[in-house]
Design a protein with these regions (language model features):
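Conserved phosphate- and dinucleotide-binding cores of soluble alpha/beta proteins
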Residues: 1-126
Length: 126
């Protein structure tokens, strides 16, 4: 079984927000976690979270240092994140490796900024 869900944003640890964009409520979790778990627990199964790398005409990265909205799917439940720049397999990876893989599938215009944010988070705990 392979499940595919969408997201509004994903942070550098792999946490997924699929419910709220800024102050605008976009929808409930709608069983996303159930589908994610089903895909991951099925023999040879996978769970994909798919999203465009940017929003607002390319001016806003959807892979972010920290979520602006609530966590819909916890990082421990996330298997694979997919953008138009590739797939980041996160299951079983360290936080540092998750961060590296997510930056690699972010829009190229935002990778340096995300790398700096990741460095700040690692060194300052911010």
């Amino acid at each position: 079984l392979v499940t595919i869900n969408s997201a509004l944003e994903v942070d550098l640890t792999g946490q997924v927000n699929a419910a709220q964009s800024g102050a605008a409520y976009m929808g409930g979790t709608g069983g996303q976690v159930d589908f994610v778990r089903a895909g991951m627990r099925s023999p040879d199964g996978h769970s994909l979270i798919a999203l465009a790398s940017t929003a607002k005409g390319g001016t806003l990265s959807k892979i972010v240092a920290t979520l602006a909205g609530p966590v819909t799917t916890a990082r421990t439940e996330v298997d694979v994140i997919v953008t138009e720049f590739g797939a980041a397999e996160l299951r079983g990876q360290s936080l540092a490796e998750r961060t590296r893989r997510l930056i690699a599938i972010a829009h190229p215009d935002f990778r340096e900024e995300l790398d700096r944010a990741a460095h700040t988070i690692r060194t300052r705990g911010v």
